[in-house]
């Protein structure tokens, strides 16, 4: 039961893990021979203490995000436009971005090709943004999540948005596109990997279709590969996500 408890804990199911750690203690198990993390404790009592701290936190976070999912509109958004203030200073135009991200002007045929390959309808808000610029690194490269607690991540880094020009490495169907992250890095198959982060693949931003189906309006989530692929809800839709992006303090000082 100790192995099962560890597996649950590493899958961000601390509330369930707590029960199994307690069962292990009742059976007389005091220490764990091998742990999955170098800095993890070996004492079962220490694991129980950890789980007792994190179990209520996990329950609170899951409840909060479940309510957001239930309230949000899952029907596809139509006629989406971005405010000028949102677009102002959004992109970062360096040599790498132009070479590896930025594609040719996006067409309806490009969107249809990507949708067919990935099996999902792209949000109209994403298409609207790609018609303005077909992918690129972001100058507004931070997003504040809705779940604000002093024990969890509040600000999420976003390095760039993947476009629909498959000749670019960092595009939805490019060399380091959505399928690459799902098939090679084993990210959960819940939708489309839409944005990278500064971790180089150890956490990603996804369009999550798990509660709306492939033709619905996906929400935007953060997935932490290093944290057992923990999913954190960010925004009801892609437009709200882009609207909420902001630059680092250093970039703000440069304006």
Describe the residue ranges of each PLM region.
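Residue-level signature for tetratricopeptide repeat
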Residues: 7, 51, 55-58
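Boundary/linker segments of alpha-helical solenoid repeat arrays
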Residues: 1, 27-44
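A surface-exposed partner-binding patch
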Residues: 64-200, 249
